Amino acid sequence: MNPLAPVLTIDGPSGAGKGTISRIVARRMGWHYLDSGALYRAVGVAASWADIDTSDASALVRCTFDTHVQFVEQGEAMRVMVNGTDATDELRLETTGALASAIAAIPEVRAALKERQRAFRELPGLVADGRDMGTVIFPDASYKVFLTASAEERAERRHKQLKDKGVSVNFDDLLREIMARDARDAQRTVAPLKPADDAVLIDTTGIGIDDVVARVMDLLPVPAA
């Protein structure tokens, strides 16, 4: 970790566009990228592979330390390797997201992952995408953004994403899952989902990706040539 490296945190609920916006901005700035949600999902997948119950906090903490995660760029896409296995597709499943949300509510797991996330802070800079990047992991970040969108729009985006992949899912079920996850994330006692006091709030409902990226880039220094 390099404490001198500038950090942009992009927080928000599932489906607000954090991942897409963060990857584009990181690429344009030439900065490192941290997908904190993928770390929690990776632990969830590893725990599932090892048949660890989500109520077994000590086993989950051990799993957190034992799980090796790599982000590998393939063109415009980002693949996530978990213990040497490409788990990208499994990480995107709604069931994995629900599992990650449950695991994220365990204080011991969050504590174990805190330093691992901070280790991504290196020069020339870092774009950190998550739910508590600006409030807990990088409270001293120079640039903070909180993205949001209506639950209906986020469900619509996810529904289209899954449909494009040939995955059949009921929209109403998807909407209920997103709303339930929002409630869990906002009500948990440890690091609840909320914008940092000094974050710039951007509602992405009805706004295109290019416009959101432009708003975020306006907050940052001019990228190095």
From Swiss-Prot:
Keywords: ATP-binding, Cytoplasm, Kinase, Nucleotide-binding, Transferase. GO terms for molecular function: ATP binding; CMP kinase activity; dCMP kinase activity. GO terms for cellular component: cytosol. It is found in: Cytoplasm. Coiled coil: none annotated. It comes from the Bacteria. The keyword Protein biosynthesis does not apply. GO terms for biological process: nucleobase-containing small molecule interconversion; pyrimidine nucleotide metabolic process. Signal peptide: none annotated. Its EC number is 2.7.4.25. It is an enzyme of class 2 (transferase). InterPro entries: Cytidylate_kin, Cytidylate_kinase_dom, P-loop_NTPase. Its main location: cytoplasm. It catalyses: CMP + ATP = CDP + ADP; dCMP + ATP = dCDP + ADP. Belongs to the cytidylate kinase family. Type 1 subfamily. This is Cytidylate kinase. It comes from Stenotrophomonas maltophilia (strain R551-3). The lineage of its organism: Bacteria, Pseudomonadati, Pseudomonadota, Gammaproteobacteria, Lysobacterales.
